């Protein structure tokens, strides 16, 4: 619990947990889904939030409605992908989520993935990276994003070897897809002279 000019702000950090572990920790054999796990964690956390305090929840979860990229794996269980409905977070003033790489709101403006600061795959080429700044006020939240450019971007280049080799040198992470019709001998070694982080 922290204090600012508007009073107390309680923070609850919920660790990712599988159902079997949550059943043991909470002594509740009815926990059978990721939503049940989050609900049990929130019930326990809520008991420690002082009356009148604003409440910020931090969680690693796959919340229904989130936009998934190529490199994020769904939290899959027997029977399908298990998502957590946004409604389980009702009562929290702000929910800061981790798992999905693209910054996005899920369910409502106070439930948000901040996004990954670095690209994890070439499907994220061209995505604007940002950080999320949240002001949790007594009368609501103010969310703003601050865009930034990581030291290295990810890019995908497609074309014939000679054209790509003649491109502008960069330290970015570059995926190279060659379209030459004849086999080339060790093209990667030569490409790395121009693109040291090519793959």
Name the predicted role of every residue range.
Residues 1-199:
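Extended recognition/assembly regions associated with phosphoester-bond processing machinery
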